[in-house]
Structures are given as C-alpha cells and as structure tokens.
C-alpha cells in the first residue's frame, strides 16, 4: 500500500482515517440526542421507575413494532455517548416459570438533565440549538468566508439573526425557552454559592434578560433588591412584573435604566468588540448615578484558554465560539480579551470567579 506523504505506517493511516470519519459523522450524536428528546425516551425511563427493556420502552413510546430494531440501534449509540446505561435484568419468559436475563436501560446524570420535570433541564436548549434554522446555517460557512455578509446566518437567510428572530414567532419562542431553561441552572448557583456577589445592592437591571427567568430567581432570593428586566418589545411586551420585579422594553444600545448593578448573562458574547465597548459604556452610565459603593457590572460568560480545564470543556467552549462565528458577530473571549474590553470602556478593575462550569461570573468595577 502506498502511504500518503507524512504518514509513516499503515496503522497511522487507519487511525487518521477513523479520526476523519468520526468527525464527518459527529453530527449524528447531536441528531440522535434530539430524536431521544423528541420521542421522550428519558421521561419514559424515568416514569418506568426501574431499568427498562427495549420492548417495554417501545411500548411506552408507542413505537411502530416494525421499527423496534431501529430503536435498539438508537439506544446503542446513546449508551455509547453516555446518555444511558445498559444493565442486565431478569424477565419472566412468557408461558414458562423461568426467568432469563435481558438488556435494560437506565438514566445517567446526562439524561437526567433532559427530563421535562427536572428544574435544571437542558432539553429546550438542545432542541433550540439543533433546530434547522441554526444547523442549515453551517452549509453556508465557506461561502460566508468569501462574501461581505456579517455572518453565515445572513448569507443563508438574507438578514441578521436578531432580525430573523423578531420575524419568526416559532424561533423566538424556541430561543426564549432555551435561555429560560439555562436560567434555572445559573440561578441555582448564583443564589447559593455566589450570594456575596449581590451583597449591598439595592437595585439591578438584567440587560437582555428575555422573559425574566434569571431575574425572577434573583428577585426571589433577594427580596430587598429591585430587579428590572430590559429587553426588546417583542420579548417583554405584555409581560407583567411582581413585587420587586419589573419589565422595561427597549434597546440596550439606546438606554439602560439606572441601577446599582447591571447583570448580563450570555449577552456580550453575541457582539463584536466595538459593539461590546458601546454596551459596556451604556452600562457604566447606568450605574454612574448610583451612590452605592458596591455598584458594578455582573457578567455570566465563557472565558477561553483556561489551562486547568479538561479537553472536553475546551472543545465545548470552541463549539460555542464557532456558533457565534456562524450565527452572529460575536465570539468567546480569553481573560486578556475581556480585560481589554473593560478597560476600553472605562472600567478600572474586574474579578473572574470560575464557578459555573464552562462559564464564569465576571464582576466589573467602575
């Protein structure tokens, strides 16, 4: 066998081929996961209460009996991907007194995060990010590199993602549900392990806070703090507040309500550096009228290039960064890049707390 230049052995060639094939077909992992959520596989196993056999699972999901082998193959790849465990259970043989062993499936920590009843469920996020509106954009990435569009999304749809989301009610709902489900996870940590971040604050504005899922959790945890959600009219129009929570419609590039603190979760990564500096300057204006010595900006964002993280964590951050490249004008940033933005916007100091897994809490001080 003639080996390509730079490959020294047949084994190296075969390993290289397997590596390439693995990446060619890696989208199948995402689509298999999406299928599992749409079929309700995690919920069916959870409802069963014990490890569930293939036939029991097929019955619970009302699967076409002619396609039970397809369900077996779907479960096989999902077990391999770590979403389910396969165990042996004893089942009674029909018409006999004997029992025999059969394969059965149980939940893993990953699939428990896909349960509809789980407060920290990421199922809505998974369904949104695997929606064709997002995935079809990737077929235009190479074209985008050679044209003048701001993102591959614009190349595909002829408009920016925010413009598309405003015009498409279905996508708007999907996106807001995805952001709301993530809020449960963030709130569970912010309001327990990071309570000191909110010490001394009497008012806070959640900029780009969507339907208020994050702000509601913070407002409930800190009843003495006035919380305001600022977002576009198509997002917050018609939403009603409660005791210490209110909604304001508007564009953060035009104005941000005054407060002791400005909170932004996964907002700045949507924008390029110039736009981020503009947003941060608006935030600085919003807290400048406060006499509170604790005034600051609170960000929940990814910080790239963390030498202590795992290979999988780095890869996931790179996925997020490429998503920003394809869909909008933003990016994920290193600590050095974050620091430059803060200082360019007139802030004097910042503090990064790595407490949210892939993301960090960043406090920015005037």
UniProtKB/Swiss-Prot annotation:
Enzyme Commission code: 2.1.1.88, 2.1.1.-
Pathway as given in its UniProt record: Flavonoid metabolism
Keywords tagged on the record: Methyltransferase, S-adenosyl-L-methionine, Transferase
InterPro entries: COMT-like (IPR016461), O_MeTrfase_dom (IPR001077), Plant_O-MeTrfase_dimerisation (IPR012967), SAM-dependent_MTases_sf (IPR029063), WH-like_DNA-bd_sf (IPR036388), WH_DNA-bd_sf (IPR036390)
MF terms (GO), sorted A to Z: 8-hydroxyquercitin 8-O-methyltransferase activity; O-methyltransferase activity; protein dimerization activity
Biological processes annotated in GO: flavonoid metabolic process; methylation
Catalytic residues, chain numbering: 269 (proton acceptor)
Statement: the UniProt record of this protein carries the keyword S-adenosyl-L-methionine: yes
Superkingdom of this protein's organism: Eukaryota
Catalytic reactions on record: 3,3',4',5,7,8-hexahydroxyflavone + S-adenosyl-L-methionine = 3,3',4',5,7-pentahydroxy-8-methoxyflavone + S-adenosyl-L-homocysteine + H(+); 4',7,8-trihydroxyflavone + S-adenosyl-L-methionine = 4',7-dihydroxy-8-methoxyflavone + S-adenosyl-L-homocysteine + H(+); 8-hydroxy-7-methoxyflavone + S-adenosyl-L-methionine = 7,8-dimethoxyflavone + S-adenosyl-L-homocysteine + H(+)
Amino-acid positions noted as binding S-adenosyl-L-methionine in the UniProt annotation, renumbered to this chain: 207-210, 231-232, 251-252, 265
PANTHER family, A to Z: O-METHYLTRANSFERASE (PTHR11746)
Family: Belongs to the class I-like SAM-binding methyltransferase superfamily. Cation-independent O-methyltransferase family. COMT subfamily.
Subunit structure, as described in the record: Homodimer.
Described purpose of this protein according to its UniProt entry: Flavonoid 8-O-methyltransferase involved in the biosynthesis of polymethoxylated flavonoids natural products such as pebrellin, aroma compounds which contribute to the flavor of peppermint, and exhibit pharmacological activities such as anti-allergic, anti-oxidant, antibacterial, anti-proliferative, and anti-inflammatory effects. Catalyzes S-adenosylmethionine-dependent regioselective 8-O-methylation of flavonoids; active on various hydroxylated flavonoid substrates, including 7,8,3'4'-tetrahydroxy-flavone, 7,8,4'-trihydroxy-flavone and 8-hydroxy-flavone 7-methyl ether.
UniProt-recorded name of the protein: 8-hydroxyquercetin 8-O-methyltransferase
Organism: Mentha piperita
